[in-house]
C-alpha cells in the first residue's frame, strides 16, 4: 500500500507519539486541504511508488521519463531506441537509456566519466557500424553561459553498451546542440545552434570545414511571449526525398509560452530551407496547460512505422523537477509536412506498442552500489580523481570528505521525478568529517541538514542558518529524512534507534532555473566534508501519493 504525503510527514513524529517543536509543544495535525479546482492526472505507480507513464491499458500519460531528463537525443537501432539527456555538471554523465516502445525506459550506463565541464544537449549517431555521441561542453568554471566558451567533444564505441572512447575535442568551439546528419553527397555534418552547420571528417571525430550559417530560423511573431528567438537543438530527418530540420526556438525556460518546435525542409543538405507553413508544430499556448516550454524535439519512427516526437517540458507548478521527457505522436500531411496531434498532453494517449510489457525506471533505494554510479548517484562538479572518493562495501557507501560544507563538497545527487517523495538514509560520521542529506540545486542554492558529532547544522538557500535551530546534535550514528511534499520540504533527524524529530521545514518552489539560472533541477543529495569519511547505509526512496 502506498503511504500518503500526510503519513510521511508524520512518520518520524508518530514514532514518539507527539511532535516536539522549538517550544516543546506538540504539533497540530495536518489539516485537510480544500479540493483542487480540477483533478490531477493519474499515473500508474511503478518501482517504490514512482509515477509511471505506461498506464497498463494500451495508453500512456506524459511524462514518459519523469524528472530532469532534458534535451532528449534519441536514436533507433534495430528494435531498440537509445536516448541521452543533458547531464550538466553531474558525473559520471551522458547516461544512456534504452527502450523498445518509446514509453518504458531503463538505464544502460554512463558514457562519460572524465569531468570536462557542463555537458549540454547531445546527439547519438551510428555510421559504418560504429556508434557516436556528440557532446557540447560549457567550460566556464561556474557552468553558466557568459561568453559561451563551448567546445564539442565526441565519444565512440562498437556497441551502445560501451566501452566508450575517451572524449575527443573536435575543434568546434563556441557552439552547442550538435545534430548529426549525412548528406546526399555522403559527407557527414553537424548542425549546430543558431542555424549553423559544419562538415566533419569521414571518421566522425574532427572538424573538416568551417562553421557556416545555413538557416535563419522561423520568424516568431512579435507579440508572442518568449524568452529569446534562440534557434537550437537541430535534428535532421531524411524522408521521401526531403531533409527535414527540426529545431527548438523561443528559449528553453523563461515564460511558459517560450519554447516551441519548428520545422524546415530542403531537397539538399545544403539548402535552401523552406519553413513549414503551420509552424510551430508544438508550443505551449498558455499558462493553464499542464506542460510549459515544450520543445527541443527529436523525430523518430515508432515500432509500427508511425511517427513520434520526443521532447522536453516543465511540469506546471513543478519547475523544481527540471525539464521532463514527453512523447507526442505526429502525422504527415498530404504535402509531406509533419503535424503533431497530441494537443496539450493533458490526458492519456495510445502507446506506440499497445500490448508492450517492458520494464521501466530505476529503483532509487538500490543506488548505494558501484554499478549504480552514474545511472543513480552522480557527483556534482567533481574534481579530478573524484571516483576515488567513493568506496562501495556490503555495508553501503563510504564517502571521503571534501571541502568545508555542501557548497564545495561535490555532493552525490540523484534525479527524483515525483511531485512528492521521501528519502531516508542512515549514516555514520568517521573522524573529523561532517555530512548529511540535502535538496540540492547547485553549489549556491540548496537546503537540508548536515551533522557533526557535536553539532547539527541546517542549510537554507545555499548557506547555513542559525534560526530556527535544527536542534541538538545526535552523535556519530544517526538517520536523516526529507519529505518533499510538492515543494514543501521537511527534514527529520534521529539518533540511532531513537524516535524521529522534526528539524526544519522550507518552501522550495523557487529552487529552479528561472530564479537561479543553470537549467538544472532540485535533487536529493548526500554530502561529506571535512577530514574523515561518511558511511551511508540503507538509503530508501519512496514516492508519496496524495491524501485520500
Region annotations inferred by a language model:
Residues 1-2, 10-13, 28-548:
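Carbohydrate-active catalytic/glycan-binding domains of CAZyme proteins
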Residues 7-27:
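N-terminal export signals
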Amino acid at each position: 500500500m502506498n503511504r500518503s504525503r500526510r503519513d510521511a510527514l508524520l512518520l518520524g513524529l508518530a514514532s514518539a507519539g507527539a511532535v516536539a517543536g522549538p517550544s516543546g509543544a506538540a504539533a497540530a495535525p495536518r489539516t485537510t486541504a480544500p479540493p483542487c479546482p480540477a483533478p490531477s492526472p493519474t499515473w500508474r505507480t511503478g518501482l517504490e511508488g514512482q509515477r509511471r507513464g505506461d498506464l497498463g491499458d494500451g495508453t500512456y500519460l506524459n511524462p514518459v521519463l519523469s524528472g530532469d531528463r532534458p534535451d532528449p537525443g534519441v536514436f533507433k537501432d534495430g528494435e531498440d531506441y537509445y536516448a541521452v539527456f543533458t547531464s550538466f555538471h553531474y558525473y559520471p554523465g551522458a547516461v544512456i537509456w534504452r527502450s523498445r516502445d518509446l514509453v518504458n525506459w531503463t538505464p544502460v550506463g554512463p558514457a562519460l566519466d572524465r569531468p570536462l565541464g557542463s555537458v549540454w544537449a547531445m546527439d547519438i549517431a551510428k555510421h559504418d557500424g560504429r556508434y557516436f555521441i556528440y557532446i557540447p561542453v560549457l567550460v566556464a568554471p561556474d557552468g553558466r553561459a557568459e561568453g559561451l566558451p563551448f567546445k564539442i567533444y565526441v565519444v565512440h564505441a562498437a556497441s551502445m553498451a560501451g566501452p566508450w572512447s575517451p572524449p575527443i575535442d573536435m575543434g568546434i568551439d563556441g557552439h552547442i546542440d550538435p545534430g548529426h546528419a549525412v548528406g546526399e553527397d555522403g559527407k557527414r555534418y553537424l548542425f549546430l545552434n543558431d542555424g549553423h552547420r559544419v562538415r566533419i571528417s569521414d571518421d566522425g571525430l574532427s572538424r573538416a570545414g568551417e562553421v557556416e550559417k545555413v538557416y535563419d530560423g522561423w520568424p516568431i511573431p512579435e507579440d508572442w511571449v518568449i524568452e529569446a528567438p534562440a534557434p537550437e537543438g537541430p535534428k535532421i530527418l531524411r524522408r521521401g526525398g526531403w531533409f527535414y530540420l527540426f529545431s527548438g526556438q523561443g528559449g528553453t525556460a523563461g515564460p511558459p509560452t517560450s519554447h516551441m518546435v519548428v520545422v524546415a525542409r530542403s531537397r539538399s543538405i545544403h539548402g535552401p530551407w523552406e519553413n513549414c507553413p503551420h509552424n510551430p508544430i508544438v508550443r505551449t499556448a498558455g499558462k493553464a496547460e499542464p506542460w510549459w516550454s515544450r520543445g527541443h524535439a527529436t523525430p523518430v519512427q515508432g515500432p509500427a512505422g508511425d511517427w513520434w516526437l520526443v521532447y522536453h517540458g516543465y511540469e506546471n507548478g513543478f519547475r523544481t523537477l527540471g525539464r521532463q521527457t514527453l512523447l507526442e505522436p505526429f502525422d504527415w500531411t498530404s504535402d509531406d509536412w509533419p503535424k503533431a496531434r497530441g494537443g496539450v498532453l493533458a490526458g492519456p494517449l495510445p502507446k506506440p506498442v499497445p500490448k508492450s510489457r517492458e520494464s521501466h525506471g530505476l529503483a532509487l533505494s538500490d543506488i548505494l552500489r558501484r554499478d549504480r554510479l552514474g545511472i543513480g548517484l552522480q557527483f556534482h562538479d567533481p574534481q579530478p580523481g573524484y571516483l576515488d572518493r567513493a568506496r562501495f562495501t556490503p555495508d553501503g557507501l563510504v564517502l571521503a570528505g571534501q571541502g568545508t560544507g555542501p557548497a564545495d563538497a561535490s555532493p552525490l545527487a540523484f534525479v527524483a521525478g515525483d511531485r512528492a517523495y521521501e528519502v531516508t538514509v542512515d549514516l555514520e560520521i568517521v573522524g573529523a568529517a561532517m555530512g548529511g542529506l540535502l535538496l540540492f540545486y547547485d553549489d549556491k542554492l540548496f537546503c537540508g541538514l548536515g551533522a557533526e558529532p557535536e553539532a547539527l547544522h541546517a542549510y537554507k538557500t545555499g548557506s547555513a542558518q542559525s534560526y530556527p535551530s535544527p536542534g541538538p546534535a545526535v552523535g556519530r550514528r544517526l538517520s536523516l529524512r526529507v519529505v518533499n511534499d510538492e515543494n514543501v520540504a521537511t527534514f527529520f533527524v534521529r539518533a540511532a534507534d531513537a524516535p524521529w524529530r522534526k528539524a526544519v521545514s522550507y518552501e522550495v518552489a523557487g529552487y529552479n532555473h528561472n530564479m537561479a539560472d543553470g537549467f538544472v533541477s532540485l535533487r536529493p543529495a548526500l554530502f561529506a566534508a571535512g577530514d574523515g569519511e561518511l558511511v551511508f547505509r540503507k538509503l530508501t526512496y519512496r514516492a508519496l501519493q496524495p491524501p485520500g
